[in-house]
Swiss-Prot record:
Residues 279-296, 308-319, 372-387, 418-435 have a biased composition (Low complexity). GO terms for molecular function: ATP binding; kinase activity; protein kinase activity; protein serine kinase activity; protein serine/threonine kinase activity. GO terms for cellular component: cellular bud; cytoplasm; fungal-type vacuole; incipient cellular bud site; nucleus; PAR polarity complex. Residues 12-34, 247-524 are annotated as: Disordered. The lineage of its organism: Eukaryota, Fungi, Dikarya, Ascomycota, Saccharomycotina. This is Serine/threonine-protein kinase CLA4. Residues 396-408 have a biased composition (Pro residues). Pfam families: PBD, PH, Pkinase. Belongs to the protein kinase superfamily. STE Ser/Thr protein kinase family. STE20 subfamily. Residues 546-825 form the Protein kinase domain. It catalyses: L-seryl-[protein] + ATP = O-phospho-L-seryl-[protein] + ADP + H(+); L-threonyl-[protein] + ATP = O-phospho-L-threonyl-[protein] + ADP + H(+).
């Protein structure tokens, strides 16, 4: 027979792995006589142990042993049996006891074991899978493929140890001995990490969650930005998703809106009129797929004394006074029959479409035609939303009530509504169409919710970047001037802010990467809340103490009224308030009254917290809480100090010098306002309270040029046990970098916001207002200290002041105590020099 013929008869079974070869004979380790020497064997008989495993033909040395619990997938699969497990060189054996003389009840060759992995069937348990068909097992890597393909030949046994260390010890020992496992186990508890990158050829991001991809697709974040700081891009996306309602409807970014004021309310500050803004609707989603709540709404400029007469009727809440005017005589005819949910946005004469930036002015003579166009656009947006939910731009047909903040001055465009806890049921539509009813839940997509600046942005920059602040006295700045949108001299309606909007409760939240949810904080029961409210409220009928002058605004959970005090109660709570008050109340005082419906407040405990904070924070630079009345268990009246001058935002927007080449305010005026604000902040910080939402909207003035801080809905108190916070609240453009990066922070975030507010008064808007929402957050996180438009026109003192306020490193950022000693405040003007800024209200 030839060699080739013999080779054809060789089968795979002729080359089976029959185990290790027997050990060769070796000399005695103690130097004694070996067996191959010429000696009488009888002298060595005593040294022979016929039962020794070292002299057997096959290796049976024991490597590891111990007691375990065992069960298989056979007839007794429901019983865990106690067995003694032994690991030998060539097999694993299970015995009834630890005596090696007994036969094993189960012996598994190591060459038949194809898988060993931990299982949750029992604590400290692992599964051993073996192949029962010996013919299907072959050596090498190919054998595992053959065995795994034949599921019928597999059998499993489960072995449980007593401790975690025993479990890992057995796994390591079995892996090391089994030839088919190669010492590498199957993965356990693994997580699939998504690799995100940027493809320069296609210009798109790859390997990214779907909702992130849609956000970045139309944003201004470029591949260069990704390459420069990809971690910052991820932080921005996580920030946007986590705090824009992804998986949690409470974490929504409140959306500022604009509307029209009543000519009968010229004496009201726009902070009051801000509550009216909740009555008007705007498109809530930009065409980029990014939430339009950061789309700019500040007008570039506006001539003073240009108001469009609109009067608000009574709201859905019970009015305070039945004599409250509800006339429509001041409403333009073409607006009287406009349904509430089709009420257009008219700010600065612009009517943005699809949530984009305004493209051009709208002439007042064409307002009716523009209104019809907006209605058609909103109908188209609803149809588009049915096909493309991510690009929804119109309002939802059924608004849901959003809790109304306690402070009547509150402009309602903060990041997170502190009273929001869960989505509310939709409100029924009101029969009175001419009354502006707030529409809080107009965004049907969480990603379309509430991430929007408060002002109309100028045209995108076309010149070089702004120059940074000089770090020393000799620093010079030579930069190109960034153009700002031209001033609109046409007659436009007076503008204000509208209430935030919330995503609908029944809309599916977007997918993507999300952080683990933190456990919910325990909340007080209704009985506890009512008990605390009664302790801080006056037990009297407020309708007998105040005469309502006019209605300033309407919210989903309450109304705001301008009233005059007619009587001072004599209850003990009121006497205590009078004794602790800075200005004793008098009959005839003008006050602001916020009437709140408690049943429409999801988190009533925050109302109690805010009242307590305001009650303990009485200062000449803080809008003071006067008193509160719990009329019924569902009707709360909060009385606040009246600031007839309006907000700093209104003063900036209506300044006669607010144009491309001049600052809205002079440096002495800025120094005075910032100094007064800083004094109020120092008072709060000395009490370990962080305001967390300092901006021009929350700084109010009166006719005597007194400057006061308002809006304590987002304040937090620091303690020894919790000296820092990490909650993402506030308004994005005024946020410090550490807040955007989701790091812990302290009182110095208010100092950063104070510096941004100073830039507002210098340039008419905060930095990055004209940027895409995600790009703005990216720039805040990466650029740090923003750059000025015209640093060459500023004094050295104000640039030094900004440099210590806007220091990225918190360790070197000034405190409010240090700021009050800064030389910039030496140039502050007298209060009478601010009266010219209030002439636009006359």
């Amino acid at each position: 027979m030839s060699l080739s013929a013999a080779a054809n008869k060789i089968s795979d079974n002729d080359f089976q792995n029959i185990g290790p070869a027997p050990r060769p004979p070796s000399s005695n380790s103690q130097g004694r006589t070996c067996y191959n020497q010429t000696q009488p064997i009888t002298k060595l008989m005593s040294q022979l142990d016929l039962t020794s495993a070292s002299h057997l033909g096959t290796s049976t040395s024991k490597k590891k042993s111990g007691w375990v619990s065992y069960k298989d997938d056979g007839i007794l699969s429901f019983i865990w049996q106690k067995r003694y497990l032994m690991l030998h060189d060539s097999y694993v054996a299970l015995y009834k006891n630890d005596k090696q003389n007994d036969d094993a009840i189960l012996k598994i060759p190591l060459t038949s074991i194809i898988s060993v992995s931990r299982t949750q069937l029992k604590q400290y348990c692992f599964e051993l899978v073996r192949c029962s068909d010996r013919n299907s097992v072959s050596s090498g890597s190919s054998s595992s493929l053959n065995v795994s393909s034949d599921s019928n030949s597999k059998k499993s046994i489960y072995i449980a140890t007593k401790t975690e260390s025993d479990l890992h010890s057995w796994l390591d020992a079995i892996f090391a001995k089994c030839p088919l496992l190669s010492g590498v186990s199957s993965p356990t508890n693994f997580t699939h990490k998504v690799h995100v990158g940027f493809d320069p050829e296609t210009g798109s991001f790859v390997g990214m969650p779907t909702n992130w991809e849609k956000l970045l697709k139309h944003s201004r974040i470029t591949g260069e930005d990704w390459n420069n700081n990809s971690a910052a891009v991820i932080q921005v996306l996580q920030f946007y998703q986590e705090y824009n309602g992804a998986g949690n409807p409470t974490n929504t970014l409140d959306k500022p809106q604009s509307g029209e004021t009543s000519s009968s309310q010229k004496s009201l500050p726009n902070s009051y009129n801000d509550n009216k803004l909740r009555n008007n609707s705007v498109n809530s989603k930009s065409s980029s797929g990014v939430s339009s709540s950061m789309v700019s709404q500040r007008k570039t400029s506006q001539p003073p004394n240009t108001k469009s007469p609109v009067s608000l009727g009574s709201g859905s809440l019970p009015p305070i006074n039945t004599k409250l005017p509800t006339s429509q005589s001041n409403i333009p005819r073409h607006l009287q029959n406009v349904p509430n949910q089709q009420y257009p946005k008219m700010r600065n004469g612009h009517s943005p479409t699809n949530g984009q930036f305004p493209r051009g002015p709208m002439h007042p003579n064409n307002s009716q035609r523009s209104l019809q166009q907006q209605q058609q656009q909103q109908q188209q947006q609803k149809q588009q939303h049915q096909q493309y939910p991510y690009h929804h731009q119109g309002p939802s047909p059924s608004p849901s009530p959003s809790p109304s903040p306690l402070n009547p001055y509150r402009p309602h465009h903060n990041m997170i509504n502190p009273y929001s806890k869960q989505p509310q049921s939709p409100l029924s539509s009101q029969s009175t169409q001419n009354q502006a009813i707030p529409r809080y839940a107009q965004n049907s997509s969480p990603t379309a919710a509430h991430f929007q600046p408060q002002r109309t942005a100028p045209k995108p920059p076309i010149s070089a970047p702004r120059a940074p602040y000089p770090s020393n006295q000799n620093a010079t700045s030579n930069t190109h001037v960034q153009p700002v949108a031209p001033k609109n001299d046409q007659s436009t309606p007076q503008t204000m802010r509208q209430a935030p909007k919330r995503p609908d409760a029944d809309v599916a939240q977007p997918g993507g990467v999300a952080k683990p949810k933190k456990p919910a904080r325990p909340t007080m029961s209704t009985a506890e809340i009512m008990s605390k409210l009664k302790k801080v409220t006056v037990n009297a009928d407020p309708s007998q103490c105040f005469k309502v002058i006019e209605k300033a605004g309407q919210g989903a959970s309450g109304s705001v009224y301008l009233a005059e005090r007619t009587h001072i109660p004599t209850e003990s709570n009121m006497i205590e308030l009078i004794n602790n008050d800075i200005d004793e109340p008098h009959v005839g005082d003008k006050v602001a009254i916020k009437q709140m419906v408690l049943s429409k407040q999801p988190r009533k405990e925050l109302i109690v917290n805010e009242i307590l904070v305001m009650k303990d924070s009485r200062h000449k630079n803080i809008v003071n809480f006067l008193e509160a009345y719990l009329r019924t268990d569902d009707d709360l009246w909060v009385v606040m100090e009246f600031m007839e001058g309006g907000s700093l935002t209104d003063i900036i927007e209506n300044s006669p010098t607010n144009d491309n080449s001049h600052s809205p305010l002079t440096e002495p005026q800025i120094a005075y306002i910032v100094r007064e604000t800083c004094q109020g902040l120092k008072f709060l910080h000395d009490k370990h309270i962080i305001h967390r939402d300092i901006k021009s909207d929350n700084v109010l003035l009166d006719t005597r040029a007194r400057v006061k801080i308002t809006d304590f809905g987002f304040c937090a108190r620091l303690t020894d046990k919790r000296s820092k916070r990490a909650t993402m609240v506030g308004t994005p453009y005024w946020m410090a970098p550490e807040v955007v990066k989701q790091r812990e922070y302290d009182e110095k975030i208010d100092v950063w916001s104070l510096g941004i507010m100073t830039i507002e008064m210098l340039e008419g808007e905060p930095p990055y207002l004209n940027e895409d929402p995600l790009k703005a957050l990216y720039l805040i996180a990466t650029n740090g200290t923003p750059k000025l438009k015209h640093p060459e026109s500023l004094s050295l003192e104000i640039k030094r002041f900004l440099s210590v306020c806007l220091c990225v490193d918190v360790r070197y950022r000034a405190s409010t105590e240090e700021l009050l000693h800064h030389g910039f405040f030496n140039m502050a003007c007298d209060p009478k020099d601010l009266t010219s800024l209030l002439e636009w209200k006359e």
